[in-house]
Regions:
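Basic/aromatic DNA-contact patch characteristic of tyrosine site-specific recombinases
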Residues: 1-105
Length: 105
């Protein structure tokens, strides 16, 4: 069996994030990716963080926010937190929804 090449951990830097100018998914490691896509009107790029994991046998993609609001460092912290929850069998999306409801009351 052929061994796969190890994936880099923290492959992105703030400079790389700013410099990306073509649509696609750029992984940082630790279930964190930067998704770059063209805006609907086609005049600029939108960049946002996505946490991807498997929980309860299903793949879950969870947006962590736009790069203008959520820094690379903050996205990594959030991914670490949600990865731990997923390992415990907790759906991170449902967890975040409950967190937000608790803050509103």
């Amino acid at each position: 069996m052929r061994k796969s090449k190890p994936r880099p951990w923290h492959a992105l830097t703030p400079e790389k994030v700013e410099a990306l100018d073509s649509p696609g998914r750029y992984t940082d490691g630790g279930c964190l990716s930067l998704v770059v896509r063209l805006a609907k009107n086609g005049d600029h790029l939108l960049k946002h963080w996505v946490f991807r994991t498997t929980t309860q046998g299903r793949r879950v993609d969870m947006s962590l926010g736009n790069i203008n609001i959520v820094s690379l460092a903050k996205a990594r912290v959030l991914a670490y937190k949600y990865r731990g929850l997923a390992k415990e069998g907790i759906n991170p999306i449902l967890y975040r929804q409950k967190e937000r409801k608790a803050k509103m009351t």
